[in-house]
Regions:
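Conserved "landmark" site that anchors the functional core of diverse proteins
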Residues: 1-518
Length: 518
């Protein structure tokens, strides 16, 4: 057993195998440690996240002598999944395993599978043969698909799983099922839970899909306040997200710049975690009734009926007035809070839109009516400052510094690459989004980061701030909508306090990493 720090608020516990991972996960889920937020199991590791650095440090000391009690002896639940074996990769997978097509299907259906852990996407559960002697090791596709259909049944390595919704993927596809793997309103929402037994049954046809909407959403009551005239490039509903659901494959999500969102809410008298609008590229709103708003985040001009107003200040907007937030001069995301607290459809208790999984409400559109909760609010606060922590460079581009702790997989890289990672100026590429910042060296003459070892890393838990390095050697800084698990080594982890900085770095921005003590 080895414990790796992950930033300052998480630990990656490396264990001897899947059975030990499942035992630890069961024990620490049943009896969480102090301030423990999440426990994310993977093939050989368990990621534990905490609310504070002190709690993570205390947990690391406690776990050095931790021995989970015997696992539950309850009869496992059996989940049966009907599969039409019409997958695009059946023949290729059979060839890779030295089987016939019929032999592969027989192996897949006659094997009893153990649900080991969730990850990748809501409802995606990694299953391994309950009898280890029936295991195989099949490689992923050399070129992943950009879109795997919902209900696709795949295998990779020693695992089998069902894709619950359309998503990218590199597994070998054997067939299709219409069995819904995820229903947000169900308890539990994922059909297959860790510890369950799974059997696949070959069928000649499948029933129609009952619902084309894989995720259920609840619509609370609301009072109309603003009409969207122009949502800009993209405007999303965001709040504090869905922490603590990583075992379901659900990432925390939430406002990309949480300090800016909280400041806007406090300014208008809302709770810090109330829902706000998160905007890129400017937005134009019309007031339907008298209300109070506040804009924070990126440096941008805000106009009320063509008169400029200050960022981070509560502003009275009378019925019929127009509010314009112009595109940012530097920074990236603007946040708009409305007194009372914006109301949007909720899923798993949150109105946050997760762009990777598809959880949460759709992006805001022209003509949408923005409503608020029918409740009283606290006093407004006009003494706040905008918490933007990026700066404007000499050529007008945004720049920032991200504090980080090396690891947990810094030993996968050469010393020269570790030095280069910290010394270089990196540039944010246009392929960046709420999932992560994709970086490239600001100087074309600089070589990609190099690994010190061969092979691939088994998928393991990720956090916002994980800096993955794919085979290209160009880092990716995970943001709020990151995948729950990932398979590339993490060279460093950005401090939780600096994720807000990363969220305000647009394409073309430059960034440096600054090493701090863990």
């Amino acid at each position: 057993m080895h414990i790796h720090p992950v930033g300052t608020r998480a630990l990656l516990v490396e264990l001897d195998g899947l059975s030990q991972v499942m035992a630890w996960h069961e024990a620490l889920t049943a009896q969480p440690l102090k301030d423990q937020v999440d426990a994310i199991a993977a093939a050989t590791t368990l990621l534990l996240t905490f609310n504070t650095p002190n709690s993570a440090h205390a947990a690391a000391e406690f776990l050095k002598d931790f021995h989970p009690s015997a696992r539950s002896v309850e009869e496992p639940r059996l989940v049966e999944i009907d599969v039409l074996y019409d997958g695009e990769d059946v023949d290729e997978a059979a060839s890779l395993l030295g089987m016939s097509r019929e032999g592969l299907i027989d192996w897949h259906t006659s094997t009893e599978w153990l649900a080991a852990f969730g990850g990748f996407a809501p409802g995606f559960t990694y299953c391994t043969p309950a009898d280890a002697s029936r295991g195989v090791d099949i490689p992923r596709r050399s070129t992943p698909r950009t879109a795997v259909p919902a209900g696709a049944v795949g295998i990779a390595g020693n695992f089998s799983a069902v894709y619950p919704r359309v998503s990218p993927g590199g597994w070998q596809l054997l067939g299709t099922t219409t069995t819904p793997m995820w229903e947000s309103d169900a308890q539990p929402p994922a059909l297959v839970q860790p510890g369950d037994r799974v059997r696949y049954r070959a069928v000649s046809s499948l029933p129609d899909i009952v619902s084309t909407t894989p995720f259920g959403r609840r619509t609370p009551a609301r009072l109309p306040r603003m009409e969207v005239i122009d949502p800009g490039l993209v405007t999303l509903f965001q709040d504090q997200g869905r922490p603590g659901r990583g075992n379901l494959g659900v990432t925390p999500s939430g406002a990309a710049d949480q300090a800016a969102a909280a400041t806007a809410n406090v300014a208008v008298g809302n709770p810090r975690g109330a829902t706000v609008l998160e905007n890129i590229g400017g937005i134009r709103l019309r007031a339907l009734t008298d209300t109070v708003i506040c804009v924070t985040g990126a440096q941008a001009r805000v106009l009320l009926d063509e008169m400029p107003v200050h960022l981070a200040r509560p502003v009275l907007v009378t019925a019929g007035s127009t509010v314009i937030v112009e595109p940012a001069t530097y920074g990236m995301r603007s946040y708009i809070a409305i007194r009372g607290g914006i109301v949007a459809d909720t899923e798993l208790g949150s109105a946050s839109t997760d762009v990777l999984s598809g959880l949460g409400p759709a992006p805001v559109r022209i003509g949408d009516i923005i409503g608020v909760l029918p409740r009283s609010s606290a006093m407004t606060d006009a003494q706040l400052t905008n918490p933007l922590r990026v700066s404007e460079g000499s050529h007008g581009q945004t720049s920032g510094v991200l504090r980080c702790v090396l690891g947990p997989r810094d030993d996968w890289f050469t010393q020269d690459s570790l030095d280069a990672f910290l010394e270089r100026k990196w540039e944010v590429t246009p392929q960046s989004n709420r999932v992560g910042l994709r970086l490239t060296a600001a100087s074309a003459a600089e070589a990609p980061l190099q690994r010190a070892r061969e092979g691939e890393l088994p998928s393991e838990g990720m956090v916002a701030g994980s800096v993955q390095v794919p085979p290209s050697g160009e880092p990716v800084v995970f943001l709020r909508d990151h995948a729950v698990t990932g398979g590339y080594p993490v060279i460093a982890t950005v401090l939780e306090e600096d994720i807000d900085i990363a969220a305000q770095l647009p394409p073309g921005a430059t960034v440096r990493f600054e090493l701090v003590e863990g």
